[in-house]
A protein has these predicted regions:
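Nucleotide/phosphate-binding catalytic cleft detector across ATP-hydrolyzing
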Residues: 1-188, 203-212, 216, 221-290, ...
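A structural feature that tracks compact, well-ordered secondary-structure segments
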Residues: 197-199
């Protein structure tokens, strides 16, 4: 029996990963996934930088400590994980080269910073022209900014390193990472810092994909305003101790976080419902589909249960089976991008 084009594509995607790399370029972190032997290896750097006093002595100390930095116009910037350490030391905030999932238009130092961060996690290609897939956000439904510029700049950085770069939607990457056993059919949701990315896929082919700019940073800012706290403190509590399954006595910040998490989940589900209404020629999906949740904003205890409860109330226009967290919520985008890169490499 002759196999269809879709069946052949799924077989390739399920094949053993050999060459290629996957890169998740997020607002908070840059991550890379690649294969070493039979293991998938992940590298990560915080997507941030911090200006420190520029002197020969400082430069020597940083060199000896192997701290990543850039010197630009007589200014010295520490980049990556160490930037946060320096910021905490001086009780100041780091700066980010990305805003809402794309290269920041207001941060004039963004380009050299993101280039160095990408180079530090991706490293040299195994051979010239090795395929690397990098994640990109879907077109935002609630904002206007230039995704094309972002894509072309990242492509340029990776080409300079010797790669053949290709882009993949962030939500689609989650599906490739998590839904091999379901023939890559389902909904992938990436709850990041700057955006929530959504993709509905049928037999590995995206049906619709989009993003919204209400996400983790938005929650921090709204809660901070509501309770008169700093966004940094709200974020620290959200990341370290928030439990969305907790009932009874909640602190003021916990109560506000719970309210805004509800609002975010409702907002995402309502936008998914609208996309179903707007999309023509939806495929006939016979079985209930899975929804995969991932990203740093999805990490608090009880998030998946909270999502399920709200979904039961709001209901999608197609049957939903499993609603579950990705196996590695912070790594699934990079892993999915690696699956795509490896599938392309196997066709060579």
């Amino acid at each position: 029996m002759t196999k269809t084009k879709e069946e052949k594509k799924i077989e390739i995607l399920k094949g053993q990963i050999q060459k290629g790399k996957g890169v998740d370029i997020g607002t908070m972190f840059v991550k890379c996934a690649y294969k070493e032997g039979n293991e998938i290896v992940f590298r990560s750097q915080r997507n941030s930088f911090f200006e420190v006093e520029h002197s020969d002595f400082t430069k020597k100390i940083l060199d000896n400590s192997k701290v990543k930095y850039i010197i630009k116009e007589d200014k010295l910037y520490v980049v990556g994980d160490e930037a946060l350490e320096f910021a905490n030391m001086f009780n100041k905030e780091t700066r980010r080269p990305l805003s809402r999932g794309v290269i920041s238009p207001t941060e004039k130092e963004a380009l050299p910073m993101i280039e160095l961060l990408i180079k530090s996690v991706v490293d040299e290609p195994t051979y010239k022209g090795e395929i690397v897939y990098f994640s990109v956000p879907g077109e935002p439904l609630d904002a206007e900014f230039n995704i094309l510029y972002h894509i072309k700049m990242i492509e340029g950085f990776l080409k300079t390193l010797g790669y053949t770069p290709k882009s993949i939607n962030e939500g689609h990457a989650i599906i490739l990472s998590e839904l091999a056993e379901e023939d890559f059919t389902g909904i992938g949701l990436s709850f990041g810092g700057g955006m929530v990315n959504v993709c509905l896929s049928f037999l590995s082919v995206p049906v619709f994909k989009f993003s919204v700019t209400k996400a983790g940073d938005w929650i921090d800012q709204q809660v901070a305003m509501a309770v008169d706290e700093t966004a940094s403190r709200v974020s620290a509590i959200k990341e370290s101790s928030l439990d969305l399954s907790k009932e009874g006595t909640l602190s003021k910040i916990e109560s506000a976080l719970s309210i805004y998490y509800n609002h975010l989940i409702e907002y995402v589900i309502e936008n998914i419902k609208q996309e179903f209404t707007k999309t023509r020629r939806l495929p006939r999906i016979a079985k209930p589909i899975s929804i995969i949740l991932s990203g740093g904003t999805s990490l608090p205890t009880g998030f998946s249960n909270r999502f399920r409860q709200i979904l039961e109330r709001l209901k999608l226009p197609i049957p939903v089976g499993s609603v579950r967290m990705a196996s590695q919520p912070l790594r699934s985008v990079a892993k999915g991008a690696l699956v795509a890169a490896s599938a392309d490499e196997s066709k060579k």
